[in-house]
Amino acid sequence: MGASLNEIKTRIASTKKTSQITRAMQMVSASKLTKSEASSQKFQIYANKVREIVTHLTATQLNDIASDNPRGDINYNSMLISRPVKKTGYIVITADGGLVGGYNSSILKQTMSILEEDHKSPDDYVMIAIGGTGADFFKARGINLAYELRNLSDQPSFDEVRKIVGMATTMYQNEVFDELYVCYNHHINSLTSQFRVEKMLPISDLDPEEATTFDQEYIFEPSKEEILAQLLPQYAESLIYGAIVDAKTAEHAAGMTAMKTATDNAATIIDDLTVSYNRARQGAITQEITEIVAGASALE
């Protein structure tokens, strides 16, 4: 019985130490989440303004494209025009490691479902992985990666992802693939995220009718077409970067939730072990008393 008591005490002490670690990790993830949410909100202000300018610039082209009535005097930007799809590009965003609950598995499972349902052969798509978990997952299944990016910081700057988002945009312009999607978990709140597959190229999220609702008037120098040639790739890059920031926020939320769950589970285990310890201790005391009483009776 004594050995059992010591074993339970050791397990209680070990679980308490683990609980302290998971609680600290929960607090760190909560801090990262707060910073990521603030960064995401700031970026959204910038993204909305860029979108407003791009919508204003592309209103005429978008209306012509929508009505299937192109004009000979306008050089339509290739990033706005859908073309026959021979190959599809995917950017898949995961975490670099674990301790984030089902965050990674959710993204990878649903991405694989898309690949299996929409494509007959790996030759039909191009994969780009952001995050070590996703990169290792695809390599283990023999899926070639056009590019991979690991060890992204907790609050990624545009400079960190400039190469990969610029490369993805250039690959589309060079017709390496004919459409580009980003697969990631969208942050809703600290407890909830939602898997998303968003089409980034060709650019399809602009509504020409919105151009009439803007109060600003713009004077362009040089021409609209020349400005769009520079601005549209930057806009596409900002869309991809926005998805990366959103995914990173969801990752921190998943990490915080996973560590909170681990801490709560540790507390439950400690409570159960404490009850077991008290019962074992009570049993040991009862047995000792019984033995003393029996010994005293034998002496009488």
From Swiss-Prot:
GO BP field: proton motive force-driven plasma membrane ATP synthesis
Molecular function as annotated in GO: ATP binding; proton-transporting ATP synthase activity, rotational mechanism
Protein name: ATP synthase gamma chain
UniProt keyword terms in alphabetical order: ATP synthesis, Cell membrane, CF(1), Hydrogen ion transport, Ion transport, Membrane, Transport
Family according to the record: Belongs to the ATPase gamma chain family.
Subunit note: F-type ATPases have 2 components, CF(1) - the catalytic core - and CF(0) - the membrane proton channel. CF(1) has five subunits: alpha(3), beta(3), gamma(1), delta(1), epsilon(1). CF(0) has three main subunits: a, b and c.
Record Pfam families: ATP-synt
Source superkingdom: Bacteria
Gene3D superfamilies hit by this protein: 3.40.1380.10, ATP synthase, gamma subunit, helix hairpin domain (1.10.287.80)
Topology in membrane: Peripheral membrane protein
Localisation per UniProt entry: Cell membrane
GO cellular component: plasma membrane; proton-transporting ATP synthase complex
InterPro entries assigned to the protein according to its UniProt record, in alphabetical order: ATP_synth_F1_ATPase_gsu, ATP_synth_F1_gsu, ATP_synth_F1_gsu_CS
Function noted in UniProt: Produces ATP from ADP in the presence of a proton gradient across the membrane. The gamma chain is believed to be important in regulating ATPase activity and the flow of protons through the CF(0) complex.
Underlying gene: atpG
Main location: membrane
